[in-house]
């Protein structure tokens, strides 16, 4: 074959260094939970570094990069870095960032569940932005003998700006590997019965401990999903429809109607129109309309983070109270609740079918 027929980029391609392949090596299966990411510390420098990576993703901000990078580097990072660091510091746990802490707990909780059901798999997690990166963890899994990897995003509803970009990062890492593992992806589980059950259980258990809203007296449950620009809906992103689907199934599981329950979208960034109604203005309007109690739950967030603890628990609460509301409740996210861990195991097991993950005898503890 003549090199003239080989694409120029292929001639200059460089692959990551890898150890020699051995036929006798362990052929293991891995489940990789993928979440968004978090700064390494609640400091302006760490937050700016994280935001620079996050907001430089063209799937997150769909503006020509040459223009956007000037805006990002000269205006947004200098201003938002310090302000965001203060917010992170307010929610930081002794063990670290809430998102990382709860994600690690999910991993440690699902491992024994797999083992108890006869699965011998490696379970780990990675972050799309920050550490541990998807590329680094995939490399670690390969060194541990993983030849098959299930990518399980912690985003129940698919969106280009979350699920797709996580897959982009994974495939980019694979593109640098000479010896690639087999990979499967979980696109979404917005309507999965186990996920809906876990959501309903989380709400029920919170109400059992803190009292159920007096819906007959006008109290409300607000289901707040992370927002995205409205134009993404017009361009074919299924996120909005899947959020509505999740909300409808959860309301049905709780026996609620659209009178008792509202669906909203939070975390708007910039001046463009995002999916509506917006969470904070809705809570302010409810308070002004005489709603005494409002409970807010975030079904699209599988682990508590800045957007749920600080934005909902502080900023949105203040909007409701200033509007005239009396009692505000933020229902914690799924985190490592037993029902959610069981759901994670079920969703993963369905997508592991056909791979050699079961053992005939009592399994060893998973790595």
UniProtKB/Swiss-Prot annotation:
Catalytic reaction list: heme b + 2 H(+) = protoporphyrin IX + Fe(2+)
Family membership noted in the UniProt record: Belongs to the ferrochelatase family.
Protein name as catalogued: Ferrochelatase
Localization in the cell: Cytoplasm
Underlying gene: hemH
Residue numbers binding Fe cation: 226, 307
EC class name: lyase
HAMAP family cross-referenced by the UniProt entry: Ferrochelatase
A GO-annotated cellular component: cytoplasm
